[in-house]
């Protein structure tokens, strides 16, 4: 547990902090709890869609990320299958990254598509070897082949850049490119953090934490480094979010991130797409992405921002 006395922080800045349930901000406990609670809201009208029964029910998606403990209350029972590509970690230990992205995608309180099911491939990003990510994606491709029509894996959320310019990976980068082409050839959409036209379409943005459902008040980039998201990309909320946390089996918790990276945006966009596929499962990946782009809103700062409600309305129209 970390305890901060009143004179060690400025209460006005709490919304910008990163902290977990084990952090105590003396004198601001109520505000801290409020910020943690508000951060669970995906914003942009997602909860209104949930009230209408649009929750990703019946849709299979996939994640490739670090090792995950499967029983956090946000997503217990939602992992359809789990495959470890070679993390070599204690089975009772988790990572910071994996529960966060999983909860953003399918979390009960946090998630964009809480009723979707996840095929999860655990990959050791710290080894800097893209072969593990490729291995995970090939596993997803093979699992997908076993599924009947109507239950196919639609989209893979990869909060990493296993190849491309600026990639932190140092080995077997081409293996990722080849695996992505194989997945796309099988009709599976892959979203990752590379700067490419087909997979790198998501950009970081952030909502107004006081008015998280107001898309026009969203801004591109990060609270400390804003930029305008161009029309070639889709801005998705990555900051002021609360995510699931579990480092040891049986000790689930939450972490609030005043500033999240693009990693938090990929599963969010994946979740929105899952909502779309629930509404019209007949659409293919290219049609779905096209509608996602067409229905974006322009925020006050000129950024191209995801608009989940407009997206769902447009998907509904394709059924008529």
Summary of predicted features, one role per range:
Residues 53-57, 111-114, 148-152, 183-185, ...:
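Extracellular/periplasmic catalytic domains that process cell-envelope and extracellular macromolecules
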Residues 1-39:
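Autoinhibitory propeptides
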Residues 149-160, 278-320:
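C-terminal subdomain of the subtilisin-like protease fold in secreted/lumenal serine endopeptidases
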Residues 59, 66, 79, 85-168, ...:
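Subtilisin-like peptidase catalytic core
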Residues 31-61, 85-91, 216-219, 306-307:
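N-terminal domain-start motif of subtilase-like serine proteases
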Residues 2-7, 44-86, 188, 192:
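Acidic-leg catalytic submotif of subtilisin-like serine proteases
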Residues 171-191:
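Catalytic-core regions built around general acid/base machinery
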Residues 65, 184-188, 192-278, 282:
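Extracellular S/T/G-rich loop segment that most often corresponds to the catalytic His/Ser-adjacent loop
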């Amino acid at each position: 547990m970390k305890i901060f006395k009143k004179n060690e922080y400025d209460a006005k800045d709490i919304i910008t902090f990163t902290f977990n349930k084990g952090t105590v901000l003396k004198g601001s406990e109520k505000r801290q709890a409020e910020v943690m609670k508000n951060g669970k809201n995906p914003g942009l009208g997602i909860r209104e869609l949930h009230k209408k029964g649009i929750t990703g029910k019946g849709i299979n998606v996939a994640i490739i990320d670090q090792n995950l403990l499967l029983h956090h209350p946000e997503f217990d029972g939602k992992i359809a299958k789990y495959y470890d590509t070679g993390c070599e970690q204690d089975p009772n230990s988790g990572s910071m990254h994996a529960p966060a992205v999983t909860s953003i995608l399918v979390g009960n309180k946090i998630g964009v598509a809480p009723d979707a099911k996840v095929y999860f491939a655990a990959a050791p990003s710290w080894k800097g070897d893209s072969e593990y990510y490729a291995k995970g994606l090939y596993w997803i491709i093979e699992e997908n082949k076993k599924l009947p029509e109507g239950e196919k894996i639609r989209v893979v959320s990869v909060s990493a850049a296993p190849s491309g310019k600026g990639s932190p990976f140092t080995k077997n980068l081409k293996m990722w490119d080849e695996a992505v082409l194989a997945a796309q050839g099988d009709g599976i959409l892959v979203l990752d953090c590379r700067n490419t036209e087909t997979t790198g379409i998501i950009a970081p943005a952030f909502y107004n934490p006081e008015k998280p459902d107001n898309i026009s008040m969203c801004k591109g980039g990060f609270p400390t480094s804003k930029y305008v998201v161009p029309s070639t990309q889709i801005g998705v909320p990555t900051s002021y979010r609360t995510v699931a946390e579990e480092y040891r089996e049986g000790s689930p918790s939450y972490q609030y991130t005043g500033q999240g990276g693009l990693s938090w945006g990929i599963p969010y966009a994946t979740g929105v797409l899952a909502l779309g596929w629930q509404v019209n499962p007949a659409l293919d990946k290219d049609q779905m992405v096209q509608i996602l782009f067409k229905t974006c809103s322009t925020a006050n700062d000129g950024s191209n921002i995801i608009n989940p409600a407009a997206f769902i309305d447009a998907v509904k129209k394709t059924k008529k």
